A protein has these predicted regions:
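Glycine-rich phosphate/pyrophosphate-handling loop used in enzymes and phosphotransfer proteins
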Residues: 1-193
Length: 193
């Protein structure tokens, strides 16, 4: 996935992307979860560059695609955007939280406030390395919590993650947001596996 800082993607690359045209994935505690792309080929490679090699220019591209997808698919007003956080250890290793960067790009594109509403309170195994849905759910159960003092009462909150597979991480975080008062949680990812 060749991304140019000043132009984004060339038109030829845009045509070859694995566009995800379904209406959205059903995820527990979310109204829907939207993703503009399928997680394969050039998208998978681009996400790996973004997450593991510091290709932060991808955040702008992916964030723009996510914002357009949310605008086109959801169509209702949202009150704020938040993200699935990484642990402090992972933040220290990478130097950035990829989902926070994505959330900030989506917020900038849509003119919506971005808030840090969640924290990851324990390390988990990488979800991508776990194959069964039940094991994925067990891996993230209790790993997230709403930040102390956060009040989302009556709000429609967009929850940003990079990729949705089984929906276990998204559901766990969405449940925390609902406990913090969110009326609706709308999932938004770059890609769906």
């Amino acid at each position: 996935l060749e991304v140019w800082e000043d132009e984004g993607l060339c038109h030829q690359c845009q045509k070859t992307l694995p566009w995800q045209l379904e209406v959205g994935k059903q995820v527990n505690f979310c109204a829907r979860c939207f993703s503009p792309l399928w997680y394969r080929g050039s998208v998978r490679r681009g996400m790996e560059q973004f997450k593991f090699r510091g290709g932060q220019i991808h955040a702008r591209l992916f964030g723009t695609l996510m914002a357009q997808c949310l605008h086109d698919q959801w169509g209702e007003e949202v009150d704020c955007i938040t993200w699935v956080p990484v642990t402090r250890r992972r933040l220290g290793e990478r130097g950035f939280d990829q989902c926070e960067l994505l959330a900030r790009e989506v917020g900038k594109n849509l003119g919506v406030e971005v808030v840090s509403a969640l924290e990851k309170v324990r390390d988990t195994k990488q979800q991508a390395r776990i194959t069964s849905s039940s094991a994925r759910q067990a891996n993230v159960t209790g790993a997230y919590t709403a930040r102390e003092g956060i009040d989302l009462t009556g709000k429609q909150v967009v929850l940003v993650d990079d990729v949705v597979t089984s929906g276990a991480t998204m559901a766990e975080c969405a449940a925390c947001l609902r406990i913090a008062g969110a009326e609706k949680v709308i999932g938004q990812t770059v890609a769906r596996a």
